[in-house]
Amino acid sequence: QFSIKVMQSSYVGLRSTVQFLQLSQIIWIKSRIAKSENDYINSMKKFLSHKKQNNRKFHTRSMSNGLGSLNLQKRPTPSPTVLNNKFLPTRNQYHSEDINNNILFDIIIKETDKGLKKCVLIGLNLTTNKIFNMEYIDLNTSNRKFKIFVANNLINIKNNGINIDNLYIPKRINSKTLTDLITLSFPNIKVQWYLKSEITNLFLKSDYTNFIKEINERKTLGKSILSKLIIYYNDSSPHCNIGKSSRKVTAISHTKRDIHTSTENNHKKDLFGWHRFNSSNYYDCIDSGALTIEINKLFEYYKDNFTQPFFVVNAKIKFPTGNVRSIGFGNVTTLTDKETLIKTLAIFLEREDIHTVMSYDEGDIDESKFPKGSLSFDFKPLKTIEGTKYANYTFPIKKDIVVKDINKKINFNGLDLPKTMDLSKWPNLKLNKDKTSGEIRMTIKNKNNQSYDIIGHMIINDGENVITFNRAVDNSIIKIFTVTDSMGNTNDPNLFKRIVEEKGNQTVYVYENNETVCVVQDKKFGFISKIAKNKTVNLKSISTLDLETRMDTNNRLIPICMSYYNNKKLNTFLFKDDWQEEMLAAFKTLLKSTNHGKKFYVHNLAHFDSVFILDTLSKLGKIDIIMRDDKIMKLKITFKIPGKNTEYSISFLDSLLMLPNSLDNLSKAFNIENKKSVFPLKFTNGAVTPFNYIGAVPGYEYFYNTPNKKFTKDDYKKYCKDFNNNWDFNKELKNYCEIDCLALHDILTLFAKMIHNEFSVDITRYVSLSSITFAIFRTNFLPENKIPNITCTKLHYILKQAYTGGYCDVFKPEGKNIHSYDINSLYPSAMAKFDMPTGTPLHILGDPYKFTKDPFGFVFAEVTAPDLKVPIIQTRVQTSGGVRTVAPIGTFKGWYLLDELINAKKYGYTFKISEAYLFERLNIFKEYIHRLYTIKSSYTPDDPMYFIAKLLMNSLYGRFGMDPITIKYSVLTPEESEEKLKNSSCIEATTLPSGNVLFKENKPLGEFSNLNTSVPISAAIAAYSRMIMSEYLIKYADNLYAVDTDGIKVDTEIDKKYVSDKELGLMKHEYTFKEAVFVAPKVYGGLFDKPYKNKVEIVKVKGLKEPIQYSDLKDVYIKSLLKLFIILNFLRQLALSTIVIKEQPYSLRVSSFKRVLVFNESGKIISTLPLKLENDKIVSNPHLIVNSEGNPSAFKLSLIKI
């Protein structure tokens, strides 16, 4: 117990800033470590009494030299005073001049297994009634690291007493937890971690008394050591056991991760609950390398603290915005299955759009970029793997998969059946005289190890034996199982098929020479069903809403105008002062009983408008949300009108998800009267919005002119003619916003009529284009009981490995006279041409050719690729740029559509199959594609039906591959959120400005609705599309410069038999480059040999919205190999209800993580070669240095260039 005076000082030489969790998650931490007030009071009493009796002494020391001041003065031990069950020490035992700095400390010291001391300090400021300081020192000699954590002004003491919900030593506490507790009450307090291996040697010395002095004398370290308060204690200080529970702090040694403590008692209590492991590292690139580092730490921690072999893990990214996002879904794993977990999460990092409304703008992303932020893991030990709700959606993907039990005997509780149809080798078989039947008597055991007799009756036919095994129970005969052996056409008793049927389930075994070569089981699923046609379309429900925003001096977008049209009346509001209050008032006019059931469509709700309106709506009623990939697809508000008990509801949907094009282009495509107008939006930016401006039309520079929306100077002149120095800002802003609402309403109404007239589907029942096309297919074209509905099952995630995208590679970086060809509707042509996997899938362990002569489906195979210039079979592999889908040469394993491997055989590929899922063949899309293609061909390109048919043709196939794990979102009040957090396990949350909390929960599909997914369909369509493209890649390998899914760039004209402007599945010649460069996949540009669409050049850079010149792209390749561009990105911040426009650098460089770069003598990239794999690992040099004359200087020059 001390009186401590702490001089205020600032932190210097900060190494990093700890990122804080959101309020909702802090409450979650609070609920987990709560301890009753009385328990703490009793513990403190006993502790103080124990100290007084033992007259314990502590050494003191002061600090100076700019690092703060610490004065420790021994004081008499006070007697605690209990007032109304509130614990406060008696103040009159302290000097009055120090009263504002008097602190009562609770100090616990624990000796670690390394013989070092660990100190925990809790301080109570006697005047301010705040827990004032908490400090950990953790030493780890094995890794020679030193960590100090300092937390100031920890907890408020409420009502002149101690609020100890968050106070005492929790069962598992780390630096993140402490930081959160601090910021809960003191948002402005900074908390810092310090990690300095240079000062480790100071702690390894036996004399700790010189620690502070030596630190202050180290000038090189003086700016990086904490400057608030360093606790120093005596070696001989004994441990403190407080209260009846004897809560000992367990010191756990870690290297570069958080310091954790746990209590022995509470650890067992929540053993099978959810636990969180936070990373202390921030990554500019969270790729598979970052995953590997943090998962290694997680597994190390789990091994030290848990004994359960199975546990489920949810991985999450925390973005710089403070928002969080899951990577994939819950994965059941074991300590021996770490590599599988890393590969699984890496696949989700590669395939999922991690950068969404919760994090960044999608414009900041290109193929080589991964999210920024830190990682955390929620994990839960499992009592057993069987029967858990997680067992169905694990991701059991291993490259070294082995069929473990393929050769074991059929064994039913002790019954072994011979692997031959030669009946002379069957023991205990008694045949009748004509040898057409027989009987077997055997004894087997039940589950309780009780023996009982069974009788097998065999019927012998030509090439087939059927044995029915029965058991006598209480004078009744019970059928147990049936075995049917058949040789087929082989007439070989040692090569036959055995079907075992038990309780309606069948398993097929194929035997050859007394060995099991194939095991087949039915995988029973339901089927995607037809739906009824909609007799009418609810046109009256179609309403529209639009927001206009301005940018303030902090580059934040702020709403200034809102219009909505409810199919009868336009309402428009200007936000001149407090936009949030004014928007709240505007929405109150919308929430009327007359609007009940209306659907207000907002163009780009998911990425833009929802950021501004979500929090406002949450203040007015109950919010239900449909989100996918963090895109708000639908907001539904349920509300009551004052004085009435009736509940009403209104929905807000994103029309851009239904019609993915700009409003300007849609206005032209649908040829509506109310076409989108123009407005000088840049004129609204700045410190003050010129609402009262009336005068000349603002200058041309205030109008946006982009590649997607041209506004020329001639357009500006025409616009100005309508005004004569009487341009009214308020009037024109309202007009602009209102026309957007009317235009969108006209487009959606026309779209709804056309879809219903043609297909009898009501678009107002659906939220996206893919769901509309799926409904059209199910209503008009779906064959009954054919497409398996594969949802929350292991099979979905196995076959998803076979679902990879199209080819996307660069083969040569520059060239002249380059022809660009694109296939007419690649995916629709594959859908129309090929059979799809349908029916009940059969799971086969072993070679499926042993089961059937013509297997069809997906196989797990070891592939050997020949030395092709352009390989055509893809696999996922770890490269320098993370996990990439590549087409290599060499040997590798994976899941594939068997037809794709058969197609590759003619080019020299070989493969060995060890497992398969077989389906029935059926062409299910031919009629659907033919109908849409006929519609498209019947209209001119300027007709809306042409536009609609083209959209529908390309919007169906991906719907079948939708991930069956869905997510539940909800918006709760602060009170509801605190209760929710106490009872929920896997939660991510964003606290909105109002204090309401947006929750995201991972839930298995079964807890929601049937999503009707069938990933084999999508995987097959993608594979057949690659098969179509493979013919061109092989035939024109010597001429190929780049490929991008459905198009190729070659330096020759391809055979005319492959070319057609309209025919489905053939190539269309787009243009010819006079010269071109191909910097990376999806990054290329060139000069046209003649104008194309009124352009002389084109540059395509994935992820770069702002246009750049071909000369810039050429410089990247020819000169520096690296060029930086400054681009504008829209950073959506739901937590602040705003969007920030931020300038960010975009680095453009020659890169290839998918092929080997080939250099010439001058260090210039001249070509690429395929990666070479051996057993799934890269063995080729990722940057191959070559030259024609063997000039040794080429290696040095090129290496420097790289």
Curated annotation (Swiss-Prot):
BP-aspect Gene Ontology terms: DNA replication
UniProt KW keywords: DNA replication, DNA-binding, DNA-directed DNA polymerase, Mitochondrion, Nucleotidyltransferase, Plasmid, Transferase
Enzyme's top EC category: transferase
GO molecular function terms listed in the Swiss-Prot or TrEMBL record: DNA binding; DNA-directed DNA polymerase activity; nucleotide binding
Domain of life according to the entry: Eukaryota
Oxidoreductase found in the keyword field: no
Record's subcellular location: Mitochondrion
Alphabetized SUPFAM superfamilies for the sequence: DNA/RNA polymerases (SSF56672), Ribonuclease H-like (SSF53098)
UniProt cross-references to InterPro entries, sorted A to Z: DNA-dir_DNA_pol_B, DNA-dir_DNA_pol_B_CS, DNA-dir_DNA_pol_B_mt/vir, DNA-dir_DNA_pol_B_mt_lin_plsmd, DNA/RNA_pol_sf, DNA_pol_palm_dom_sf, RNaseH-like_sf, RNaseH_sf
Primary localisation category: mitochondrion
GO CC list: mitochondrion
Reaction it catalyzes: DNA(n) + a 2'-deoxyribonucleoside 5'-triphosphate = DNA(n+1) + diphosphate
Pfam families listed in its UniProt record: DNA_pol_B_2
Keyword Mitochondrion assigned: yes
EC number: 2.7.7.7
PANTHER family per the UniProt record, alphabetical: DNA POLYMERASE, DNA-DIRECTED DNA POLYMERASE
Similarity-based family: Belongs to the DNA polymerase type-B family.
Miscellaneous comment: This DNA polymerase requires a protein as a primer.
Protein known as: Probable DNA polymerase
Organism of origin: Ascobolus immersus
